Amino acid sequence: MESKQLLQKLLAGEHCSKEEMQDCMNSIMDGEFSDSVIAALLALLQKKGVVANELAGAHASLMAHATTVALSTHAVDTCGTGGDHGGTYNISTTASLIACSAGVRVAKHGNRSVTSSCGSADVLEALGFTLELPPEATISLFKKTGFAFLFAPLYHPSMKRVAHIRRELGIRTLFNMLGPLLNPAQVKRQLVGVFSEELSELYADVLLQTGARHALIVHASTEEGVILDEPSLNGTTFVTEIEKGVVRKHTLRPEEFGIAPAPLAALQGGDKEHNARIIQSIADGSASAAQRDAALYSSAMACYVGGKCACLNDGFIVAKEALESGKTQAKLKEIIAYNQALVTEYHVAKS
């Protein structure tokens, strides 16, 4: 479909088919559309509202343009859409480290911050992790430690085509929604945080289309009136679960896991150095109860989708044991140490 036809279709408020959106994204990534056309398409899609077939079509195109890496069919990603304005520290990154120390194989896909002061890549860098490992080194890290961090710019180089357009637009677009779907390891087990019920429905549809084996899509309310893209310590957490093609919905409360309610302010983050200190304090046992419990709540979910336990309550027990026994602190040190050994071995230039 020509760009003019696409624009007319979106102006009329009509949805694109999966195939139309895949072709559209191919044209964008291959440099066939001008900047002005791309900006118009993104703005019109956002105004109309993106539907599942459009998201699935864009996903298919971007994965075809990506550098993929084979890690494990059991690997888990913990990733959120961002945009919830909760201002929390890097809970999903912390959860991935705790889950890894509990025996879950983690393939975390992430980037530097877009909507917060500190993204997953930022905080890992502050912990001493070098982001720019080549794929073969990342495979070695995963085999050795059970953890991989897949730095988005290395695996999705075609996204540079739209980076300046997204910056100039300054609004959320289709690309903000795609992040959790674009793991280069093509994981089939995920904990996905979203910031609305509508997005939960959308992601469930797309994850079914893309063959998810076990996924939890999470958003939560708070007493402060903020919607989070992670479990809440003082409100209701809404979970859409996908397992082997079946969709189930749950609601959770912190007290079900023995978690004491805590205000959102107790989970506030800051810059990458501040958030790295929080992660280190959780690992060494000196963090506040609220900081620890928020990480364990998400870790329980990662352990569950990773197949380490039969239910979320057992996942909480498994994650808590790993943290309190010192396994998480040891795992964090192991990951950073081997990452740095690989930097030397592969002559990686640090940014």
UniProtKB/Swiss-Prot annotation:
Quaternary organization: Homodimer.
Binding-site residues, anthranilate 1: G80, N111
EC identifiers of the protein: 2.4.2.18
GO cellular component term, pick one: cytosol
Similarity comment: Belongs to the anthranilate phosphoribosyltransferase family.
Function: Catalyzes the transfer of the phosphoribosyl group of 5-phosphorylribose-1-pyrophosphate (PRPP) to anthranilate to yield N-(5'-phosphoribosyl)-anthranilate (PRA).
Binding residue positions for anthranilate 2: R166
Keyword list, A-Z: Amino-acid biosynthesis, Aromatic amino acid biosynthesis, Glycosyltransferase, Magnesium, Metal-binding, Transferase, Tryptophan biosynthesis
InterPro entries associated with the record: Anthranilate_Pribosyl_Tfrase, Glycosyl_Trfase_fam3, Glycosyl_Trfase_fam3_N_dom, Glycosyl_Trfase_fam3_N_dom_sf, Nuc_phospho_transferase
Glycosyltransferase in keyword set: yes
Cofactor binding summary note: Binds 2 magnesium ions per monomer.
Name of the protein in question: Anthranilate phosphoribosyltransferase
Catalysis: reaction(s): N-(5-phospho-beta-D-ribosyl)anthranilate + diphosphate = 5-phospho-alpha-D-ribose 1-diphosphate + anthranilate
Residues that, per the record, bind Mg(2+) 2: D229, E230
Pathway given in the UniProt record: Amino-acid biosynthesis; L-tryptophan biosynthesis; L-tryptophan from chorismate: step 2/5
